[in-house]
Curated annotation (Swiss-Prot):
This is Peptide chain release factor 3. Increases the formation of ribosomal termination complexes and stimulates activities of RF-1 and RF-2. It binds guanine nucleotides and has strong preference for UGA stop codons. It may interact directly with the ribosome. The stimulation of RF-1 and RF-2 is significantly reduced by GTP and GDP, but not by GMP. Coiled coil: none annotated. GTP binds at residues 18-25, 86-90, 140-143. The lineage of its organism: Bacteria, Pseudomonadati, Pseudomonadota, Gammaproteobacteria, Methylococcales. Belongs to the TRAFAC class translation factor GTPase superfamily. Classic translation factor GTPase family. PrfC subfamily. One of its GO terms (cellular component) is cytosol.
Length: 526
């Protein structure tokens, strides 16, 4: 096995998906704690405390206690290197999450034991389905009263259309929560709630029939034996191949806030989650073990370090090896560039990276030349597929309070829209700046960041736009005629692509009927 193959086999690149408040950010913290990446876990809801969750690093996230950008964190466990992409928990940020899910090889789904499968989880599972992403499930908050485990598994199977294979099984819940039984190790891990910030090895009883279990649990021990017999008979057996094909999800139970059930989850992840897989480019399939480097940009983050006003392009390595100072070919621009200062992440702390392998996420300093969806190679013309941009559903005109700050506003909006949470449109008929977003929170975030990072005060005004469509046509003459006739409804997006801004759904339908040669697209492949 070559060094490259060895390093690929060690990598596990994954994202955590959940409905807001299912405990995703807490679980992220605890995975890092167990992986040795952070010494003290910062509780997410302690907003006024000095300690904050490592992954919620941006100022607004610290104030509101929700994740609104994707963080990248690397940690090690059992000689495996985990790259964890923490995704926004708030539903307004679906586009950022969607793109992040194109950069992972598997996902960890977190479900609140009291609430079961929720709307956001269903949407994210649909996204994972498009690429048959393997899913591992953690049912959280067993230290609180919740629904029956059998009922939860049944709901996951029915609503998400995926087989469940329980690996651990809870013993009681809420005040009666005693721990979990590991079905494949025949061991009972007893619950201890006293170690929120420290890793304490809890007591483990080997064997379901151990007399020690009767000593510790009394009558509950016999109830557990009967329950486990029923569970074994009624549930699916874990099949690693079905899991890797995205047809089955292994299920773990625990309490992230109490560090309980995390180790079993991590051990299974290290053993069964897939290493970096081959990636489809327009030209061919790219295998991770190829000698030549390739990778794609799935996210751009402005002002990760407000002191430096920088923009970082997050790049997923797909093949070969990155080494410091390597010359890379930026396919879209056709230019070569030397990359000497790529960085690796731990939420907002960063360090220069000497080398990186397939599955790793590296940050490239971006001076406005790199866009989401860009491919980097060592000379080959490749374009990785499957990174979409969606037509926004909400629109606002941006109005500057101080006209002298107009350049700073334009720069700020351009840089923030490059991240992809909002989109910037410049109408052809005037100098307006129109922002489009998937949800209202994105407008709040943009205004907050314009003030905090660019010292620009702005307000929003309503604008008569209901939806947007990217327009294209194979006949240049027809396109020119279209541009003349509907000039007042046309704008350019932040990348210079032509967009039709519809005043209503009816307006869009009529325009599509009148111009059958023009293609109107609700998504644009980046």
């Amino acid at each position: 096995m070559s060094e490259l193959e060895f390093e690929i086999e060690r990598r596990r690149t994954f994202a955590i998906i959940s409905h807001p408040d299912a405990g995703k950010t807490t679980l992220t913290e605890k995975l890092l704690l167990f992986g040795g990446a952070i010494q003290l876990a910062g509780s997410v809801k302690g907003r006024k405390a000095t300690r904050h969750a490592t992954s919620d690093w941006m100022e607004m996230e610290k104030q509101r206690g929700i994740s609104v950008t994707t963080s990248v964190m690397q940690f090690q466990h059992r000689d495996r290197i985990f790259n964890l992409l923490d995704t926004p928990g708030h539903e307004d940020f679906s586009e950022d999450t969607y793109r992040t899910l194109t950069a992972v090889d598997s996902a960890l789904m977190v479900i609140d034991s009291a609430k079961g499968v929720e709307e956001r989880t269903i949407k994210l599972m649909e996204v994972c389905r498009l690429r048959d992403t393997p899913i591992l499930t953690f049912i959280n908050k067993l230290d609180r009263e919740g629904r029956e485990p059998v009922e939860l598994l049944d709901e996951v199977e029915r609503v998400l259309n995926i087989q469940c294979a329980p690996i651990t099984w809870p013993i009681g819940m809420g005040k009666r929560f005693k721990g979990v039984y590991h079905l494949y190790e025949d061991a009972i891990h007893l619950f201890s709630a006293s170690h929120g910030d420290r890793i304490v090895k809890g007591e483990v009883v080997e064997g379901l029939n151990s007399p020690k279990l009767d000593e510790l649990l009394g009558d509950i021990a016999d109830e557990l034996r009967m329950e486990i017999e029923l569970v074994r008979g009624a549930s699916h057996e874990f099949d690693p191949d079905a899991y890797r094909a995205g047809r089955q999800t292994p299920v773990f139970f625990g309490s992230a806030i109490n560090n309980f059930g995390i180790l079993e989850l991590l051990d299974a992840f290290a053993e069964y989650a897939p290493p970096p897989q081959a990636r489809q480019a327009r030209e061919r399939l790219v295998a991770p073990g190829e000698d030549k480097f390739s990778g794609f940009v799935f996210k751009i983050q402005a002002n990760m370090d407000p002191a430096h006003r920088d923009r970082i392009a997050f790049l997923r390595v797909c093949s070969g090896r990155y080494t410091k100072g390597v010359r890379l070919f930026h396919v879209r621009s056709g230019k070569a560039m030397q990359v000497a200062n790529a960085i690796t992440f731990q939420a907002d702390s960063r360090e220069n990276v000497e080398e990186a392998y397939p599955g790793d996420i590296i940050g490239l300093h971006n001076h406005g030349t790199i866009q989401v969806g860009d491919t980097f190679t060592q000379g080959e013309n490749l374009k990785f597929e499957g990174i979409p941009s969606f037509a926004p559903e909400l629109f606002r005109r941006v109005v500057l309070k101080d006209p002298l700050r107009s350049k700073a506003l334009q720069r700020g909006l351009q840089q923030l829209s490059e991240e992809g949470a909002t989109q910037l449109f410049k109408p052809l008929r005037n100098n307006d700046l129109i922002l489009g977003a998937v949800g209202v929170l994105q407008f709040d975030v943009t205004a907050f960041r314009l003030k905090a990072e660019y010292n620009v005060d702005c307000v929003y005004e309503a604008v008569p736009v209901t939806t947007a469509r990217w327009v294209s046509c194979s006949d240049p003459k027809k396109l020119e005629e279209f541009k003349r006739k509907v000039h007042d409804n046309l704008a350019e997006d932040g990348s210079g692509y032509l967009v039709y801004l519809a005043t209503s759904r009816v307006n869009l339908s009529l325009t599509e009927e009148r111009w059958p040669e023009i293609r109107f697209s609700a998504t644009r492949e980046l």
